[in-house]
Amino acid sequence: MFNDIPVFDYEDIQLIPNKCIISSRSQADTSVKLGNYTFKLPVIPANMQTIIDEEVAETLACEGYFYIMHRFNEEARRPFIKRMHDKGLIASISVGVKDYEYDFVTSLKEDAPEFITIDIAHGHSNSVIEMIQHIKQELPETFVIAGNVGTPEAVRELENAGADATKVGIGPGKVCITKVKTGFGTGGWQLAALRWCSKAARKPIIADGGIRTHGDIAKSIRFGASMVMIGSLFAGHLESPGKLVEVDGQQFKEYYGSASEYQKGEHKNVEGKKILLPVKGRLEDTLTEMQQDLQSSISYAGGKELDSLRHVDYVIVKNSIWNGDSI
């Protein structure tokens, strides 16, 4: 039963080094394959309005990174797919599960996107299973990511319905308050939930939420993730769509959750909040730093590629890796 498994989160885990076999971290390969495509890093900027827009998506695709466009400007999705395909780039969009989304999916037959993410807060539901089956029937070549979920049963059920990958994480994100508003979720034990779910998975798992440092990417891969979706570390850049705000002479960018009243436009079923983040500089600099840090992780793992991270030992240190310091 679940109560017998170890419960921990990112800050509770330290990975144990192996002998380094490369002469420079630049020799470490951080690329990852998802479906028929290979991407430069196993990270995905969260498909949120304050993280990604069409310009950011195009930049990421041009540079060889995976992206998922958010679903909150519904009318723009078909023109976006055409724009990306006209430029020879992959199209990766999000859909919900409302009735009109079925007709939308069917309308994409002539210009199908390479990736569709079914994006709802509680993905272990009949509505998601039915949408997976519909997409697979109408667009059989499209890679379907479904979520979000937090249990092995959910992973198995979505995979059996036809999902090509599942997204694991219920409310661990920095601007998500699901655990506070509902009492449910993987907030505070996201890494243990990832480990639990990945043991049941036969297809790729995307860890979504709770990433606070670049080292958490390596930890996610160690515990079963193929890719890692990240919000707060990608928010607040000069290119980020979030509104620019000046406070006491310092510039900030807005960052809010996908179930917040700021995104929904109403105070109903709110499970997200808004925060201000100091402007961080350019997105490409963060991506470069992430890659370099992940290359260092691979070198500590004693390998040359991401898979080496899956085989390292670890210790559970219960919140002590910061030695009393806060991040």
Swiss-Prot record:
Catalytic function, reaction form: IMP + NH4(+) + NADP(+) = GMP + NADPH + 2 H(+)
EC number: 1.7.1.7
GO biological process, one term: purine nucleotide metabolic process
Residues given in the record as NADP(+) binding sites: 205-228
Cellular component annotations (GO), alphabetically ordered: cytosol; GMP reductase complex
Classification via SUPFAM superfamilies: Inosine monophosphate dehydrogenase (IMPDH)
Sorted UniProt keywords: NADP, Oxidoreductase
Tagged with keyword Zinc: no
Catalytic class of the enzyme: oxidoreductase
Active site: 176 (thioimidate intermediate)
Pfam family, one: IMPDH
GO molecular function, one term: GMP reductase activity
Function: Catalyzes the irreversible NADPH-dependent deamination of GMP to IMP. It functions in the conversion of nucleobase, nucleoside and nucleotide derivatives of G to A nucleotides, and in maintaining the intracellular balance of A and G nucleotides.
HAMAP family attached to this UniProt entry: GMP_reduct_type2 (MF_01511)
Protein family: Belongs to the IMPDH/GMPR family. GuaC type 2 subfamily.
Name of protein: GMP reductase
Species of the source: Streptococcus agalactiae serotype Ia (strain ATCC 27591 / A909 / CDC SS700)
